[in-house]
């Protein structure tokens, strides 16, 4: 794919040498997409005006959201090793990650090597409330 993402030590997130940012705050459109896990249809009810796409890699959700290609990402069941680099890139691009219910992501609790099993939403802070409103856990 020749896609390279990194966060610089002096700030900024980059994709193939270009500075990237999360999507600007605006109403969602049918052309927007949300990166989701492959089993989303079994775990969540999503009423999103745009598309949902499973790209097969947790770090991909972070990177596509960081560059503003995806409006956001939904992830679950991960360890710190799955998200450390992606989280740094997302934060440097102006994004954040928090639990679907709105609670902050407790990173220190992941340092013991356990797997986090709750849904986490990625995106620009301004987009997260609207995304939360359209994603529900199935019973």
Model-assigned labels for residue ranges:
Residues 63-139:
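Oxyanion/phosphate-interacting regions
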Residues 1-63, 114-139:
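Acidic beta-strand-loop-alpha-helix segment within the catalytic core
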């Amino acid at each position: 794919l020749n896609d390279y993402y990194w966060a610089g030590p002096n700030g900024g997130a980059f994709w193939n040498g270009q500075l990237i940012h999360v999507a600007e705050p605006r109403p969602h459109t049918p052309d927007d997409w949300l990166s989701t896990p492959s089993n989303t249809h079994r775990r969540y009810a999503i009423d999103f005006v745009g598309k949902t796409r499973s790209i097969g890699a947790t770090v991909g959700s972070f990177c596509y959201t960081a560059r503003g290609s995806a409006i956001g990402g939904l992830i679950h069941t991960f360890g710190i090793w799955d998200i450390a680099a992606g989280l740094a890139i997302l934060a440097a691009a102006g994004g954040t990650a928090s639990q679907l219910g709105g609670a902050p992501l407790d990173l220190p609790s992941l340092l013991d090597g356990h797997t986090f099993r709750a849904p986490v939403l990625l995106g620009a802070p301004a987009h997260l409330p609207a995304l939360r409103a359209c994603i529900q856990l199935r019973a």
